[in-house]
Amino acid sequence: MLVNATNMLLKARDGHYGVGQFNINNLEWTRSILLQAQAMQSPVILGVSEGAGKYMTGFKTVAAMVRAMDESLGITVPVVLHLDHGTYEGDRKSVV
């Protein structure tokens, strides 16, 4: 279930626990990370670099893939998508 990063991290701070962030580069990595987070009942941050976003045909595709996986895999733990290691222009394009 996609959630807001600020809310996730505030809850982690208040609960005195950390949240893992893992960079995703393809469908297989994303699936594995989501399934493990669900098995551990742990929130997770999925990092997407500018390059990985381009490789996966854009950030809209990545977001749609994660939403679809959440639904089809029955992911109930909080999930955040994070734009990681990007240029200003690349990141701006991803959210416009």
Residue ranges with predicted function:
Residues 25-28, 86-90:
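Glycine-rich anion/phosphate-binding loops
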Residues 70-73, 83-87:
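Generic hydrophobic/packing signal
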Residues 13, 74-75:
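Short hydrophobic "helix-edge" motifs at membrane interfaces and signal-peptide entry regions
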Residues 5-6, 27-74:
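Glycine-rich, positively charged N-terminal anion/phosphate-binding segment
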Residues 1-20, 67:
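N-terminal amphipathic alpha-helix/helix-capping segment at the start of soluble metabolic enzymes
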